[in-house]
A protein has these predicted regions:
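Short strand-edge motifs at loop-to-beta-strand transitions and within beta-strands
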Residues: 71-75
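Short beta-strand edge segments in extracellular beta-sheet folds
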Residues: 102-106
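Short acidic/polar inter-strand loop motif in beta-rich domains
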Residues: 91-99
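Short, aromatic- and glycine-rich surface loops/edge beta-strands on solvent-exposed regions
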Residues: 83-91
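Proline/serine/threonine-rich low-complexity linkers at boundaries of modular beta-sandwich domains
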Residues: 1-2
């Protein structure tokens, strides 16, 4: 069962640049491997990641088969107000996972 680990600072000062780290537990099967009997192992990857802050999109990434299992993404953003980060992963076979984290700006 997929699960997300999120690292967002609990507090920051107005205008600070903060680092956000995400790790999603997922097999990321490329669809290029074959079984011992020669059948193709079906592709099963996360295809997109989106981060929103207080409803506004601040980061988006499209993911492809070359991404390793359990994709780790890190990015930076500037915070000017307290609020809530919302993270969304979408993938093959109807995969969808969400997580959230809040930050207080002083």
């Amino acid at each position: 069962m997929p699960s997300a680990l999120i690292n967002v600072p609990a507090k920051a000062k107005r205008g600070d640049i903060i680092e956000i780290k995400t790790l999603m537990s997922h097999i990321m099967e490329t669809g290029y491997r074959h079984t011992a009997s020669g059948d193709v192992v079906p592709r099963d990857i996360i295809t997109s990641f989106t981060c929103r802050f207080n409803g506004a999109e601040i980061f988006r990434a499209d993911l492809y088969p070359a991404i390793a299992a359990n994709p780790f993404l890190t990015f930076f953003t500037t915070v000017t107000e307290s609020g809530k980060f919302e993270f969304e992963w979408i993938g093959d076979k109807g995969f969808s996972e969400t997580a959230s984290a809040s930050i207080t700006v002083e």
